[in-house]
Amino acid sequence: MRYTVMYKKRHRFRRYLLLCVSLFFVFSCSQKGDNKKVVVLAFDGMDPRIVRMMFEEGKLPHFKKLAEMGDFKDLWSSIPPQSPVAWSNFITGKNPGGHAIFDFIHRDPETYLPHLSMSETIPPETTIEPGSYVFPISKGQVILKREGAAFWEYLNEASIPSIIFKIPSNYPPVEAGDGSVSGMGTPDLFGSYGTYQYFTTDRMDIPEDYSGARLTPVDVIDGAVREVIEGPENTFRREPVLNTKGNVKRDGEGNIKYKNPTLTIPFTTWIDPENPVIRIDLPDQKIILKQGEWSDWVVLSFKPLPFIPAISGICRFYAKEIHPYFKLYLTPINVNPKDPILPIDWPGGFARKVAENAGYFYTQGMPEDTKALTNNTFTTKEFYVQSQMVLKERNRLFDYLFSQFKEGFFFFYYSSTDLGSHIFWHLRDKNHPAYDPQAREELGDVIDQIYQQMDRTVAKVLERLDDDTTFIIMSDHGFSPLYKNFHLNSWLERNGYLALNYGKQTGSLLRGDIDWSRTRAYALGFNALYINLRGREGNGIVSPGAERDRLVKELAEKLAAIKDPENEAAVIKRVHRREDIYDGPYLDRAPDLLIGYDWGYRTSWESALGDITEGDLLEVSREKWSGDHCGATEIVPGILFSNKKIRMDRPHLYDLPPSIMAEFGIAKPDDMIGINIFAPPRVPVERELSGEGISRLKALDYI
């Protein structure tokens, strides 16, 4: 079943008036040349402190050259500095009150249940269900939940061509002049952010607790492993849900509960008894791999019904081990860019054009398989190899797309700087609990290596730079270490703000363990804290107005006073009230408080999903996910380079859209809050930080 795309309604009339004004400016500026270009390279998570350290070591010559040509400044991120929030600031020129993305995780205030913030897939409203079959009468929809227009939509209306490749928080992608492929937020064929499959004869390979994977114990029989590749659900079929005794489950009204079965493809892996070689037999192809070898992209076709078109996906196999154990890894099954079942591109067919010219590529939003590492399916070196494959693939795509770019706006996104910093921080930080001297000796400082690889991409743009081109390099945030996790919901419970059902010592919001009749505040997401507000939450008990405001003030003061008992360091640097930092039509959707953690601290994974745990409130982080950026905004600034002078001391992400539009002579709309970074302000712009200010940032040691 293919899905249609639904976008939020735009204020078309207001934009039409703006377009008329903008076209006047475009016409007036046409004497400067008809070949105006703006190139933006986005290196997610690139940190200005690391950049400056590498400048001193002479390791980033092309970044340095660009800074000397124009400028280099810290770039102020969003509050909170999470990627979906930050990129939405950049896309819309607004803060979260204007675009309604506040965290990776949002919640339904009526049910309290969490959901992903960036997009939503809605199944067909109308179906006919004869027996075990399901036939949709209407189409399903994929909704982009970010509000507000993307700035390149104004470029489109002024007939400025644009290429937007892999920008986060843009699935499904909004219209872009020449073409767009969606980035972070794009699911795999399961509808997840990335679920890999792993087949192993070693039962010890399968941990008790894991996520983001389908791990299958297998046996070798007659020299072969016979298994199936699991695909998406077959939405054209249904089968009864059975309980543990094999009986059909029914709902409260006595109706049978149904589920969609999983589509599968059988395969047989033949194992050479003497050599470390396997042959994978699929229904329409055979693949030979040596131990430690990766396959090329493999096209899979899942057939829901004989008369229904197949669902196409792509994947890669990795022969992790052949002897003495059999261990076979399969990437998440990605949407096939040559035949996408989901709306990953605009216009339809653009992803196919890219793949036909540059080869198949990961279409899932976050291709580096961090789950395979944290589940211990990958070693650190194996993750390094896989992440380098992603980077080389992205470079190949850049080379093709940049070769096609002649005029207008070009945006290209790299994820390697972000995922690499999340995972490999522990290799550069001897103070980190997960520091691994053996991996450091083997792999070196991987973050430095990735930055140097990005420097080579910068060189490619500098080679083509001309007087008609504005070149910008940016990141959405920087990085800090993750030394300890803070169990925020546990703190709320122990301090009387959150109550568990009677008899419970620990619990989970997802399992219904919270007593909402006695709960005044709860946390969901990485930086969000909500008041259990009467009239907003399904079982709210705190009255709006004075009672709510007193509670918000009390919580902010107590949270800011929390210290690490081990060293008396502040755990939380700053607590923001939403009304102090946001404005716009979606302020009422925001969390009541935004928690800005101090250097080295972050919300625990458990608390982010609403869990209440026992034990210490602070837990040492020994995971390889060792770098993070979900702290206070001022400790993780991004980078901003340009071949033009930046005439602002403290540029923000939301300043970039009006700056880019101004390069094409397009006036910004009234609801964009940013300022043109290349134009001297007519009135001095005051953007003082609360607390110590920007000087505190520059005084921070990197490690």
Q: Model regions: which residues?
A:
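Beta-strand elements within well-structured catalytic alpha/beta cores of enzymes
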Residues: 35-52, 66, 90, 154-155, ...
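C-terminal motif of bacterial Sec signal peptides marking the signal peptidase cleavage site
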Residues: 27-28, 702
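A long, amphipathic alpha-helix that forms part
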Residues: 32-33, 51, 384-410, 426-473, ...
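Secreted, luminal/periplasmic, and some membrane-associated catalytic domains
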Residues: 43, 57-58, 70-74, 81-85, ...
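Low-complexity, glycine/alanine/valine/leucine- and proline-rich hydrophobic stretches
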Residues: 601-656
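Active-site-proximal N-terminal segment of extracellular/periplasmic enzymes that hydrolyze or transfer
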Residues: 30-72, 81, 202
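Bacterial N-terminal signal peptides
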Residues: 18-26
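Long, internal low-complexity/basic segments
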Residues: 34, 610, 650-657, 661-667, ...
